[in-house]
Amino acid sequence: MAARLLFRRSSQILRSIQRNPQISSSFESPPCPIFHSLTTASPDPSRLSSLTFLRSLSIARRGPTRPKKIDIGAKARQMQNRRLWTYALTFSCIAGFVVIVLNQFQDQLVFYLTPSDAMEKFAENPTKNKFRLGGLVLEGSVAQPAASQEMEFVITDLITDILVRYKGSLPDLFREGHSVVVEGFIKPYTDEVRKEVSTKPISKKARNLDCFFSATEVLAKHDEKYMPQEVAAAIEKNKKIIEAAATEQAAEVAAS
């Protein structure tokens, strides 16, 4: 402690002497040997070494500065949190993209349905009105209005009949009583369309519906292999239902 105070005092005196050299001449008594050794202008190596020694002694008493400890656990937790947030954001983006793609695909997806199934789905959700209808062309239902380019015919699954209007030429293999697949939209009857339908020889079932099918494409073949399996199975099921009902009715008539 004494050495530090001595060093500070000597430094102050040295600075004051360097600023005003005339101060040294005002002292009547000769300066202290230590001060004389510090204030001399001669660059004596021994005196410089003593000054360096005092300065190093002052620094040594302060003690070495210890470096701050690095918390490895905190850094590891921070990196782990960053990874978790990165994974979460990446997964959210991927999930959102998949949902958007599936919704778009669902909107563009078109199912093969019978007229009965199509009318049931349209009643549940009128906004989803695009279908592929499969069934049989009802005999005697094909007609072309004189003042229109639209062809009209009725598709049936033996339970439900629906009027189809198609603008364009029908395929060469299109025949009454044969299978057909049409793609288009279910639309409600307008007053004009209903007035036209009332004067045409279409089935009573098709006339009693509140909507018709506006076809954008018609596909036809003579064999039943062209018909989708689900539609063919539904028609076969309806045949059995009709046959069973006819047999039951005949039995009731015979019993009476």
UniProtKB/Swiss-Prot annotation:
Compartment annotation: Mitochondrion inner membrane; Mitochondrion intermembrane space
Cellular component GO terms held in the UniProt record: mitochondrial inner membrane; mitochondrial intermembrane space; plasma membrane
Keywords for the protein's UniProt record, in alphabetical order: Cytochrome c-type biogenesis, Heme, Iron, Membrane, Metal-binding, Mitochondrion, Mitochondrion inner membrane, Transit peptide, Transmembrane, Transmembrane helix
Span of chain positions assigned to the transit peptide in the UniProt entry: 1-57
A GO MF label: heme binding
TM annotation in the entry: 84-106
Single GO BP term: cytochrome complex assembly
Residues where heme binds: 222, 226
Membrane topology recorded in Swiss-Prot or TrEMBL: Single-pass membrane protein
Protein role: Heme-binding chaperone that may be involved in cytochrome c maturation in mitochondria.
Designated name of the protein: Cytochrome c-type biogenesis protein CcmE homolog, mitochondrial
